């Protein structure tokens, strides 16, 4: 069982014009750096390294679900203000896996991840515009209720995240990625601990993190 992650830049056409060529290059350089760091940090669970497959898309393959959402959060928080949509595909891989060439792997895990990216694009054109940025699909639908529950929960988490301000994101990045306490985050950012607490509460951070951790636990219990 494998866990494919496909990420896609939202509104990538807006950074594909000649006037924004420099911005596009900077985005690709930054994204490449983030993915390289992920490949090193999470090497134990990576079956095929994360890499950019198209100018506005990247993918990677995991052999264990433990860090699926931690990896996604790392990418999202580090690439902001560029926004991304993610498809998570759970399933088998038919081809031989080359760790350094994820683009050559093929199978239901990637098909499902791709389907979810496309599904998010469809939802963005309707009433769900902006409120969904991650969806999950499994190869054989043995857990339809759990999948629906997780996707609904991810939708709620996305709605919370979309309202975060720059200052709130700064703190959340310190807490989630750097694993700092509120006191440590306050020292890093040069603010008081009470300010950190207020911003986290205003951001709905505790509801968000509980939702993400619940989904991560369910995924690990079923497929871990």
Residue positions per predicted region:
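DNA-contacting interfaces and partner/effector-binding or oligomerization modules
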Residues: 1-125
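Linker/hinge segments immediately adjacent to helix-turn-helix/homeobox DNA-binding domains
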Residues: 111-163, 219-224
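Short alpha-helical "packing" element that flanks the helix-turn-helix/winged-helix DNA-binding module
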Residues: 168-175
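Flexible coil/turn residues that form the inter-helical turn or adjacent wing/linker of helix-turn-helix
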Residues: 178
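Short alpha-helical "recognition helix" segments of helix-turn-helix
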Residues: 181-189, 196
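Key DNA-contacting residues within the recognition helix of helix-turn-helix
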Residues: 197, 201-202
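Short, Lys/Arg-enriched C-terminal cap helix and immediately downstream tail that follows
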Residues: 204-220
């Amino acid at each position: 069982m494998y866990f494919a992650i496909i990420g896609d830049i939202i509104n990538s056409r807006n950074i594909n014009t000649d006037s924004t060529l420099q911005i596009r290059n900077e985005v690709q350089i930054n994204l490449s750096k983030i993915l390289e760091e992920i490949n090193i940090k999470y090497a134990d669970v990576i079956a095929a390294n994360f890499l950019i497959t198209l100018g506005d898309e990247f993918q990677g393959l995991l052999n264990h679900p433990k860090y699926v959402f931690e990896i996604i959060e790392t990418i999202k928080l580090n690439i902001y203000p560029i926004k991304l949509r993610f498809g998570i595909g759970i399933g088998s891989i038919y081809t031989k896996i080359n760790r350094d060439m994820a683009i050559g792997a093929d199978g239901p895990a990637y098909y499902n991840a791709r389907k979810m990216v496309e599904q998010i694009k469809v939802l963005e054109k309707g009433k769900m515009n902006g409120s969904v940025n991650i969806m999950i699909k499994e190869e054989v639908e043995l857990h339809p209720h759990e999948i629906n529950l997780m996707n609904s929960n991810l939708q709620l988490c996305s709605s919370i995240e979309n309202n975060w301000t720059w200052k709130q994101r700064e703190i959340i990045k310190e807490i989630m990625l750097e694993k700092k306490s509120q006191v440590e985050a306050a020292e890093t950012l040069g603010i008081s601990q009470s300010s950190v607490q207020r911003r986290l509460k205003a951001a709905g951070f505790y509801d968000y993190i509980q939702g993400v951790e619940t989904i991560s636990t369910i995924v690990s219990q079923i497929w871990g």
